[in-house]
Amino acid sequence: MESPIRFENVDINQILKTLPHRFPFLLIDRVINIREDYSGIGVKNVSFNEPCFQGHFPDRPVFPGVLMIEGMAQTAGVIGIMSVTGTEKPRAVYFLTIDKCKFRKPVLPGDTIEYHMKSIGRRKAMWWFHGDAKVNGVVVAEADVGAMLTD
């Protein structure tokens, strides 16, 4: 049985109040279905206008895998902050670990990435999440990420 939803839709305005990231390094557009079990889904609409496509790769644009991992971490940060504070409260989020990372399929301009994140552990300010990045329901990347939330 799925855990109840705490926050159904965290829009870009709430994300901007929650995370310190800004263009060009804010890599999520919204977070949906933040549940009481510290899970949720980040959404990223990939556009050809992304700055990364100027060099990755000009003749065949592919969204960089490392940016997907950062999108997972940002999604986890929003889930952690909003779950602890009950609202968007600015916090610094320090990305600490990446484990079991795999890239499965390329992500192209026009794709929408869903970052399915679920907490797999927490100790004080430290959080660990497992994430699957999906496009059209197909896993394109996966990783376990760790972060520290501070005031």
UniProtKB/Swiss-Prot annotation:
Its EC number is 4.2.1.59. The active site is at H56. One of its GO terms (cellular component) is membrane. GO terms for molecular function: (3R)-hydroxyacyl-[acyl-carrier-protein] dehydratase activity. Keywords: Cytoplasm, Lipid A biosynthesis, Lipid biosynthesis, Lipid metabolism, Lyase. InterPro entries: FabA_FabZ (IPR013114), FabZ (IPR010084), HotDog_dom_sf (IPR029069). Transmembrane segments: none annotated. It is found in: Cytoplasm. Its main location: cytoplasm. It catalyses: a (3R)-hydroxyacyl-[ACP] = a (2E)-enoyl-[ACP] + H2O. GO terms for biological process: fatty acid biosynthetic process; lipid A biosynthetic process. Involved in unsaturated fatty acids biosynthesis. Catalyzes the dehydration of short chain beta-hydroxyacyl-ACPs and long chain saturated and unsaturated beta-hydroxyacyl-ACPs. Belongs to the thioester dehydratase family. FabZ subfamily. NCBIfam families: fabZ, PRK00006.1. This is 3-hydroxyacyl-[acyl-carrier-protein] dehydratase FabZ. The gene is fabZ.
